Amino acid sequence: MKQEGKKRIWSDYQKEIADDKFYFVRSCIRQTFFPGSDSTYIKILRDVLGKDVYENPNHTTCTGIGYHTEVVPFETIQAVVARNYSLMREKGYENYNPSCVTSFGIYTEILETWHHFPEEKQKTRDFLKKATGREFEEPKNLAHTSDVLFKFREEIAAKAKYKLINKETGKPLKVVDHIGCHYSKMFPNKG
């Protein structure tokens, strides 16, 4: 495939990533598999890049695992997500930044559902208000932590204490991050 064709195809998958003021939400399971990953991410953004990253201690899991195993109904997961969005806006943030790929998929699926079926969004508003007295707004920006790191990759590399290079050739190492197939499985243009 010619380079122009690759660039054109790749451009279909580009999305807007916020520059700052991230409302970060930890994964309920990722840290079990990759201890320190969330803390390291926050350290890179705050200490190395000087970004405003807020982590709310009242945030709850998205219940994605329960949803995908058909234990948690879709109406419930929408209300949980709406509550998390409410917490984000309450703290003055609008850029939602999940660490978990399952959560990212859930948030994306729900935003798409609300876009195509506004009655679902209204039903969720009603449930959330009745259950918690809260209201919510959708995030201005939804980006997985890998998206944010990719956006700032050159700035991170320039400030890196240790360079990832081949010691024999001095050339940069080629690396890849497997973030999980469900990151963009249902909505490839959102991943």
Language-model segments: which ranges?
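Iron-sulfur cluster-binding electron-transfer modules in prokaryotic oxidoreductases
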Residues: 1-191
